[in-house]
Amino acid sequence: MEFGLTRQEASIYQCLLVEGKVTGYEVAKLTGISRSNAYNSLANMTEKGASYLVEEGTTRKYVPVPLEEFCKNRIRRLEESKKWLVSHEPTEKTYLEGYITIEGANHILDKMRNLLSQVEKRVYITCTRNYLLLLVRELEELMESKKKVVIITDQPATFENAKVYVGENRGMQIGIIADSKYVLTGEYGEGSMNTCLYSGQKNFVELYKTALSNEIKLLSIREENKNV
């Protein structure tokens, strides 16, 4: 389904990859899908570039587009669509007003990664150490490009060129402040509500930034006292 195929079409595509050249009747028999649905799906798959139609006399058979080729074609089209969308994108406001609710673990993780990849100068991130492991690539890219990275977590973590503070158990709470303009905060992970709030509303950003700054001050004092 990630590549534009329905669940039924994906099942038929898998059948074609295994069996090779088959008729619609054979596909229906092998997959347990009704003949009418099988023929409709095969026609759709041909349009989507997942199968080829082969006519042998009066018999119509189908063969799969090789998996590697199919994937490359889909990715190429997505890249082309992305270029078109970017070139026709309307100018957005510098600051995002209002509040957006993001639900679902995958959507939240996508937002975290995208937010980090768009950082221009600095980012503050607070979460449990296990969640940091999901963001290693994005964090390393920020540090390599000399962006300021401040991390508040609950267990020791080593990141070169980043300031790491170790505080209380973060649980399922996450928070990101990007360039003092955007905030993502809420619950993420198995067993949580998997709901986050995303906003560029200036007052909200300042409040959240102040809260993190106060926590950092307390953790710094605690760290200094340990070294005395």
Regions found by a protein language model. Give the residues of each.
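C-terminal regulatory/effector modules of DNA-binding transcriptional regulators
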Residues: 133, 140-228
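Alpha-helical DNA-recognition elements
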Residues: 41-45
